[in-house]
Amino acid sequence: MTTNYIFVTGGVVSSLGKGIAAASLAAILEARGLNVTMMKLDPYINVDPGTMSPIQHGEVFVTEDGAETDLDLGHYERFIRTKMSRRNNFTTGRIYSDVLRKERRGDYLGATVQVIPHITNAIKERIVAGGEGHDVVLVEIGGTVGDIESLPFLEAIRQLAVDIGREHALFMHLTLVPYMAAAGEVKTKPTQHSVKELLSIGIQPDILICRSDRAVPANERAKIALFCNVAEKAVISLKDVDSIYKIPGLLKSQGLDDYICKRFSLNVPEANLSEWEQVIYEEANPAGEVTIGMVGKYIELPDAYKSVIEALKHGGLKNRVTVNIKLIDSQDVETRGVEILKDLDAILIPGGFGYRGVEGKIATARFARENNIPYLGICLGMQVALIEFARNVVGMENANSTEFVPDCKYPVVALITEWRDEDGNVEVRTEKSDLGGTMRLGAQACQVSEDSLVRKMYGSTTITERHRHRYEVNNMLLKQIEAAGLRIAGRSGDDQLVEIIEVPNHPWFVACQFHPEFTSTPRDGHPLFAGFVKAASEYQKRQAK
């Protein structure tokens, strides 16, 4: 089957939810038996988001092959079964870097290197490579139509639609249709102007997704269709909903997938959305609720922990409970004390970098351990739990990580200095190495101890999880820590690195070096998060007695 492309753009304002809308459409097409993948093209100059501040950009989503990507790829994986890879996300910076490298090598044979055709050709090549082997590819263009940064991408997809034939390309434009309370009606003019901007670039949208806080009336959709030169049945109303998992059904009810399949001449079965209906039912009919405190340093922007937040919700679905997440700044724990952690049913410390707020996280881990509160530590959350145990149980005064105190007496967490690249070559890295692209990244095998709590949750002694870190447990001090009672519940496939720790005399204290949140989905959940939320429910019941 020839690969078909749906190019997704956004207009009027940012943060309309292009990623969610595109992923929801992909879920419907997948439910019709099509092999679907998605791509995100980001117009910023950074080569990837790996070194960008989470407060500015949100979380960095790590793929199985170790790419540091936009958080939208997390949405994609939560909505469709296809696993994303480094082919599914690239930036302006990556494109320019590749083109300039070719220019330095002389690949362009002395030609003047320009945005058109060299940059646009590079973009097209990456899109085609990312879509190979799939029936339908949804390509989301970051930013808003009208932004200078997006122009090379828009020109590239305009050209690509011509190259592959318009019978295999659709342009879907997401736009805002605001409701004006004073007039008592929605306004279509912003949408008309946004489409006009697209037309000036040479792109005629085939589908318009109209975002609004309410359903856009049929007469207004007809008006939009007339003035934007779009088929009336291709003007879709996408109102605000209380659950993003209702969006696939909302789009399907308006015949969006039928319209697309007809345009692409795809003779496929009707979509079966029963799995999504089950998710919606579980979300709407909880048997209880728990409150979980998440102690971090980027809490002013919840998107910095997007996958963790979603994974906690998925854990709630698997236990039929609503998970109320209380975001707590770790610096507040330092200044106000652990009293602010009271009345929580469980505590989670997610990943992070840098010393700010670390002592608050260490105090949090101690509070959870000493008060038998369920604890899940992820990445840095495992490292602070280890530091706390070393200080207060083993007796290693001022134990720390060399990330925070390079010359500390007890460096229980230290930099991994020898790494193997994707070709198997040994590469030495130090504190002076570049920050970008120099971490242990992607899916890594882990051997789980038979007698561990984690073994019961996973149901297996061999698991694979995604990583993003450059510091690890210092094996030189491990014997003393184990002798004091800490259980090493999981190690890397080569038995060299500690992956999971547990406190055996605690009802539920688990910490892992990997990031389980990246593989959690609403339909399948994740063993660790399901077990963690279950432990929170059980703790709540014990406290109520």
Swiss-Prot record:
Means of activity regulation: Allosterically activated by GTP, when glutamine is the substrate; GTP has no effect on the reaction when ammonia is the substrate. The allosteric effector GTP functions by stabilizing the protein conformation that binds the tetrahedral intermediate(s) formed during glutamine hydrolysis. Inhibited by the product CTP, via allosteric rather than competitive inhibition.
Also noted in the record is:
CTPSs have evolved a hybrid strategy for distinguishing between UTP and CTP. The overlapping regions of the product feedback inhibitory and substrate sites recognize a common feature in both compounds, the triphosphate moiety. To differentiate isosteric substrate and product pyrimidine rings, an additional pocket far from the expected kinase/ligase catalytic site, specifically recognizes the cytosine and ribose portions of the product inhibitor.
Q: What is this protein called?
A: CTP synthase
Q: Which gene encodes it?
A: pyrG
As for family, the record states: Belongs to the CTP synthase family.
Q: What is its EC number?
A: 6.3.4.2
Keyword Membrane assigned to the entry: answer is: no
Q: Which GO terms describe its cellular component?
A: cytosol
UniProt xrefs under Gene3D superfamilies: 3.40.50.880, P-loop containing nucleotide triphosphate hydrolases
| Organism (species) | Enterobacter sp. (strain 638)
The positions annotated for binding L-glutamine are 352, 380-383, 403, 470
Per the database record, which ranges form the Glutamine amidotransferase type-1 domain? 291-542
User: So where does UTP get bound?
Assistant: 14, 187-192, 223
* Residues binding ATP, per UniProt: 15-20, 72, 239-241
Q: Which residues bind Mg(2+)?
A: 72, 140
> Which residues of this UniProt protein bind CTP?
14, 147-149, 187-192, 223
Question: What is this enzyme's catalytic activity, as reactions?
Answer: UTP + L-glutamine + ATP + H2O = CTP + L-glutamate + ADP + phosphate + 2 H(+); L-glutamine + H2O = L-glutamate + NH4(+); UTP + NH4(+) + ATP = CTP + ADP + phosphate + 2 H(+)
